[in-house]
A protein has these predicted regions:
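An N-terminal assembly and electron-transfer interface module characteristic of large anaerobic redox
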Residues: 2-357
């Protein structure tokens, strides 16, 4: 009987040992998975939907998860593997700043373009900060794609699905740009002369002798959506990236423009008013509601405050007409807000411009 009980005890001890060993092994595997394989979670604070949408479009790695956060999420900052802050115009109080600083001790944090020195919270080392800043400042799909890869591989330390990031693609500040017809989700193509741009249009079947011509400028919208809408209606579109240089350098004099479309936020300035007078052409001002389209549609007031002033009132000083809503925001597949041209309103706007020219 005693021998039987002893045998049972040995078996129980063996089972307990094996169970403990399994727990240790599983725990080790879980830690290894989290350290080398798991998802890299990157939080973006105070980012405009236009910029965040571009970063989202550059992300093709299923193991990288992007999230837009606000001050309401500050109690959960430890949930992320990296925090990137747009410091321009960031409004946080002392308590919120303290929360962000404390989180930065545990979570690698990078703030760029801080207008308030107190908000310049950075906890990555100088080398990483400088490299990430270069990706951000140069922008574009390639740079954003490499930035995300850099964060996963070198900041988060993951081994699985962690490709080597490419070097920073230093993008010149082109005079004109256009989306790539062969890769609409890729980086915009850049041009520094009308001759280059016209050759590109001709090569892609977009150059049309005698067609009405639009100068498209500004950054408060999805420019490719508007380019495509006008080109579909038979317009020639010159997407101006450096408007002042374009006019001062007399590049505009070689184009028989019929109208200017400015995706405005604020004034262009007196030099541009003189340009409109000389050319005797109209200036149109499509609006970006800067919020979810569904929220805007359900709001009887629609637009108010300083954003309305910068979008409607100050552009009218330049002579802008037809302040018509064309751009809104929607939720993309990553759960982030992105700017897009609202199809029916875009079509109505283009037809309205067509009626003037």
């Amino acid at each position: 009987m005693k021998k039987g009980l002893g045998k049972i005890r040995k078996i129980k001890k063996k089972h307990i040992f094996l169970a403990l060993l399994a727990v240790i092994v599983l725990g080790g595997l879980a830690k290894a998975y989290s350290a080398w394989v798991g998802t890299t979670r990157i939080a973006f604070l105070n980012y405009q939907a236009i910029a965040l949408g571009q970063i989202s479009h550059a992300n093709d790695n299923a193991m990288i998860k992007l999230s837009e956060i606000t001050t309401d999420d500050f109690d959960h900052l430890d949930d992320y593997d990296m925090i990137i802050v747009n410091g321009m115009g960031l409004r946080i109080d002392e308590n919120q700043r303290k929360q962000l600083e404390e989180a930065s001790y545990k979570v690698p944090t990078l703030t760029h373009a801080a207008t308030n020195p107190a908000n310049n919270i950075v906890s990555v080392d100088n080398f990483d900060a400088d490299y990430l800043m270069q990706y951000i400042e140069n922008g574009g799909k390639k740079n954003y794609h490499s930035m995300l890869a850099y964060i996963r591989k070198f900041i988060d330390g993951k081994k699985f699905m962690a490709p080597e990031p490419e070097r920073v693609n230093e993008r010149p500040d082109y005079l004109l740009t256009h989306f790539d017809p062969k890769d609409e989700k890729g980086d915009e193509l850049g041009f520094n002369s009308i001759r280059e741009y016209n050759a590109f249009l001709a090569k892609n079947g977009l150059y049309k002798d005698g067609a009405p011509t639009i100068l498209l400028t500004g950054f408060m919208g999805a420019a490719p959506d508007m380019e495509k809408a006008f080109e579909k209606k038979g317009f020639m579109v010159y997407r101006i990236n450096q408007l002042q240089g374009f006019i001062a350098g007399h590049h505009a004099d070689s184009i028989q423009a019929n109208a200017v479309v400015n995706m405005a936020h604020g004034r262009l300035g007196d030099y541009f008013v003189e340009f409109l007078k000389q050319k005797n052409i109209p200036l149109f001002s499509p609006l970006n509601i800067n919020r979810l389209t569904t929220d805007w549609e359900n709001d009887k007031q629609g637009m108010n405050g300083g954003f309305m002033s910068q979008s409607i009132v100050t552009p009218e000083i330049d002579g802008a007409i037809r302040p018509y809503v064309v751009f809104g925001q929607r939720i993309n597949k990553e759960g982030l807000q992105e700017v897009y041209g609202i199809p029916d309103r875009m079509e109505s706007f283009v037809e309205s411009v067509q009626g003037y020219v």
